[in-house]
Amino acid sequence: MDELVHDLASALEQTSEQNKLGELWEEMALSPRQQRRQLRKRRGRKRRSDFTHLAEHTCCYSEASESSLDEATKDCREVAPVTNFSDSDDTMVAKRHPALNAIVKSKQHSWHESDSFTENAPCRPLRRRRKVKRVTSEVAASLQQKLKVSDWSYERGCRFKSAKKQRLSRWKENTPWTSSGHGLCESAENRTFLSKTGRKERMECETDEQKQGSDENMSECETSSVCSSSDTGLFTNDEGRQGDDEQSDWFYEGECVPGFTVPNLLPKWAPDHCSEVERMDSGLDKFSDSTFLLPSRPAQRGYHTRLNRLPGAAARCLRKGRRRLVGKETSINTLGTERISHIISDPRQKEKNKALASDFPHISACAHEFNPLSPLYSLDVLADASHRRCSPAHCSARQANVHWGPPCSRDIKRKRKPVATASLSSPSAVHMDAVEPTTPASQAPKSPSSEWLVRTSAAEKATDATTATFFKMPQEKSPGYS
């Protein structure tokens, strides 16, 4: 027997040596590329065989030795909390080879783990999933209820529009400029709002739907280990990973349902006491925007016309024009005074004035009462220009009237001293001219600038005469009509 064993061993050694020699001969005959490939194959075989061999040796405990089994279970219990990095089922090695984990644990480093080490550790499983804690809060549920688009907007084809866009579109449809008789828009009672009962019913329906949806979401999250952060109605911890928390950017004002913002601010506007018939007639089942009460355009026009017809309008014109009379306007003033004096001194104009005053005494009285400049021009000019805000006769008269007082400082510097003194004493000069009519004529050749004084004095005389006749006319003929 020993000889046979020895012979077999020697034969095996010879065959192995022959095999090795044959392989070496083949490698020498092969090209360098093929040699490299064979080397790689051998290395791979070695690795695989070592790994499987080690696993087989570690797992093959003898059934008789109970102590070895106890030690293996202890090792598995110690390794479980360390190696099980996630709650998912993808760490298959830890479940199939618990003894391997003990060996891995002994090979791991004992120092404190840093981020770089945990990322680059060789014994770490390839996939690690983040634990996501999902919480459905009451705020989230209420926000989702209020952000739900209504059935009316779905019928109108704007299901996916935001509340702000719907408000804007409805604002364009219900423009506030309506031609109402009283000058205001439709009153708040005629505007269509949802009553409280309809609103409550709709909210109850939406809350029921929301409860069902949130229950479904919760059950899905419990069954599946990881849910995406874009699930509706759920606020997760990893939503703010993009830089800013979306919940802080949320603008929440009262109720988010479109059309209820103004009734919340002004609760008296929402009519709660409407009956069913009125609600059906006025169409309260639809949303409507509550516009603020604004006057209509015809009412604004009427207000402005009434404002312009007030008795202070002419005086306002005077004040407005007086602001412009700062510079040199002597040429315009002389033209205006000549025109007025020509109109007033015309005999035909005087006769016309008398006829008008005799036929219509109330017109002359009104003209004198409401118009401070009525003595300066004829009544037909007033009647023709009554629709205007400020007639040309008004303007020319007020320009002449303003400059009858002391002239500007430029005029005083330009004129000589006697002329300036004469112009400064203008109230007394009127009476002096009435007593001595030859004084302006004698002063004319003395200075070239005295023509302005001559014209103004002539205009003053004419206005004095017309004022006297105008005030006498109604008194002479009024007893006949009374």
From Swiss-Prot:
Region feature (Disordered): 198-247, 413-482
Disulphide bonds in the chain: none
Keywords: Isopeptide bond, Phosphoprotein, Ubl conjugation
InterPro entries with a match to the protein in the record: Splicing_assoc_domain
Biased composition (Low complexity): 220-230, 456-469
Modified residues (Phosphothreonine): 91
Keyword Nuclease listed: no
Biased composition (Polar residues): 439-450
Residues modified as Phosphoserine: 31, 86, 88, 447, 449
Residue ranges, compositional bias (Basic and acidic residues): 198-214
GO CC entries: nucleus
Presence of the UniProt keyword Phosphoprotein in the record: yes
Glycyl lysine isopeptide (Lys-Gly) (interchain with G-Cter in SUMO2) crosslink site(s): 196
Protein's UniProt name: G patch domain-containing protein 2-like
Organism, scientific name: Homo sapiens
